[in-house]
């Protein structure tokens, strides 16, 4: 019955909303992204609260990713983006001189075909992939030395394994796994299976999760209704409705340690103070009550497997404080 509240095409369309929101932020000066405009057909101007909310999400993601890329002594690292949509992070990292050894993006074929077409038709993107790159719009894939875009249904774990193998991911390398508003649209069993598979597959890894929480209060009820009216049911939210439940999702499925903060705390205590001062001057902002409620209903969770011992200083607090550890990881 839950599936009837979720429409695959509608969930994929949230990707267009995300790109439009990102472009709105870029145009207002919240952040730099020279490529997102290539994926937006009809630019829209978002409200200040949406712009600030999207900025806080982006800032937390980029700060944690930067920590990952700077961890340890080896420069050989890889990034795996689950449900990548039209994200342009790889191209931004190249411009910053921080491109990983391999960046793999996975999504439904309907999405990867559209993204492959944009890359094919844009020299701004295509030229960054190198002379050996091959692009197939029909197959929905892009293959290059350091970047791969591939189609897969994430719920199909055997196919997910095959795609990772096809992408030539090195399972021994430190890996940053991204899932932004992805797992929560899947049924709970599929979400757990992906978290469990990723833990078993990558022994030195960080999993970055961004999604909704607290469906049971008035704001949460309205959030759920709004999404369901668009065919975008959050099928997994009742299985992990709180910060503690988000942490348990990872700890119960093989990850060594995990921490979840709501976005109000992330913005207040983790996003760079100078950056906050800068963006808070960009637009008139008076929606403080709604801002607090909205930010309390989204969270960042990160989980860590640290076989190489390089992530001791990784995280919100940078000294490992406040993290929950699995019983096996905390045993002597």
UniProtKB/Swiss-Prot annotation:
Compartment annotation: Cytoplasm; Membrane
GO annotation (BP), single: negative regulation of brassinosteroid mediated signaling pathway
* Top EC class of this enzyme: transferase
Q: Name one GO cellular component term.
A: cytoplasm
State what the entry records as the consequence of deleting this gene.
Reduced rosette size and early flowering. Reduced length of the main root and reduced number of lateral roots.
The answer, when asked if Transferase is one of the entry's keywords, is yes
Spell out the InterPro entries in the cross-references.
Answer: LCMT1 (IPR016651), Ppm1/Ppm2/Tcmp (IPR007213), SAM-dependent_MTases_sf (IPR029063)
- What induces it, per record? Induced by brassinosteroids.
Reaction(s) the record says it catalyses:
[phosphatase 2A protein]-C-terminal L-leucine + S-adenosyl-L-methionine = [phosphatase 2A protein]-C-terminal L-leucine methyl ester + S-adenosyl-L-homocysteine
Q: Report how it sits in the membrane.
A: Peripheral membrane protein
Instruction: Fetch the SUPFAM superfamilies from UniProt.
Output: S-adenosyl-L-methionine-dependent methyltransferases
A GO molecular function held by the record: S-adenosylmethionine-dependent methyltransferase activity
So which domain of life are we looking at?
Eukaryota
Residues that, per the record, bind S-adenosyl-L-methionine = 22, 57, 83, 107, 153-154, 180
Q: Which UniProt keywords apply?
A: Cytoplasm, Membrane, Methyltransferase, S-adenosyl-L-methionine, Stress response, Transferase
Q: Name one Pfam family in it.
A: LCM
Q: Which family does it belong to?
A: Belongs to the methyltransferase superfamily. LCMT family.
Q: What does this protein do?
A: Methylates the carboxyl group of the C-terminal leucine residue of protein phosphatase 2A (PP2A) catalytic subunits to form alpha-leucine ester residues. Involved in brassinosteroid (BR) signaling. Plays a negative role in BR signaling pathway. Functions as a positive regulator of BRI1 receptor-kinase degradation. Methylates PP2A, thus facilitating its association with activated BRI1. This leads to receptor dephosphorylation and degradation, and thus to the termination of BR signaling. May act upstream of ASK7/BIN2. Involved in methylation of PP2A during environmental stress responses.
Fetch the PANTHER family from UniProt: LEUCINE CARBOXYL METHYLTRANSFERASE, LEUCINE CARBOXYL METHYLTRANSFERASE 1
Provide the protein name. Answer: Leucine carboxyl methyltransferase 1 homolog
* Source organism of this protein record: Arabidopsis thaliana
């Amino acid at each position: 019955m839950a599936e009837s509240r979720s429409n695959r095409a509608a969930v994929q369309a949230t990707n267009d909303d995300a790109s439009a929101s990102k472009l709105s932020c870029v145009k207002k000066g919240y952040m730099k992204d020279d490529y997102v405009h290539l994926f937006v057909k009809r630019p829209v101007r978002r409200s200040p609260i949406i712009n600030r909310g999207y900025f806080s999400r982006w800032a937390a993601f980029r700060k944690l990713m930067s920590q990952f890329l700077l961890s340890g002594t080896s420069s050989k690292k890889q990034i795996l983006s689950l449900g990548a949509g039209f994200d342009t992070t790889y191209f931004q990292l190249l411009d910053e001189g921080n491109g990983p050894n391999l960046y793999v993006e996975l999504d439904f074929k309907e999405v990867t075909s559209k993204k492959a077409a944009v890359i094919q038709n844009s020299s701004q993107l295509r030229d960054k992939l190198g002379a050996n790159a091959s692009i197939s719009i029909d197959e929905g894939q892009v293959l290059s030395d350091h970047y791969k875009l591939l189609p897969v249904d994430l719920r199909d774990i055997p196919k997910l394994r095959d795609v990772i193998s096809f992408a030539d991911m090195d399972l021994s390398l430190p890996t940053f796994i991204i899932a932004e508003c992805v797992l929560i649209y899947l049924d709970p069993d599929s979400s757990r299976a992906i978290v469990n598979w990723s833990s078993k597959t990558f022994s030195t890894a960080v999993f970055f999760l961004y999604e909704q929480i607290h469906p049971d209060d008035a704001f949460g009820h309205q959030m759920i209704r709004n999404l369901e009216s668009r065919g975008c049911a959050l099928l997994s939210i009742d299985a992990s409705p709180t910060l503690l439940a988000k942490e348990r999702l990872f700890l119960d499925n093989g990850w060594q340690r995990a921490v979840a903060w709501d976005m109000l705390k992330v913005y207040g205590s983790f996003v760079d103070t100078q950056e906050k001062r800068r963006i808070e001057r960009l637009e008139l902002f008076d929606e403080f009550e709604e801002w607090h409620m909205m930010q309390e209903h989204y969270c960042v969770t990160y989980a860590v497997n640290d076989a190489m011992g390089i992530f001791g200083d990784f995280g919100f607090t940078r000294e490992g404080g406040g993290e929950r550890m699995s019983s096996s990881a905390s045993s002597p």
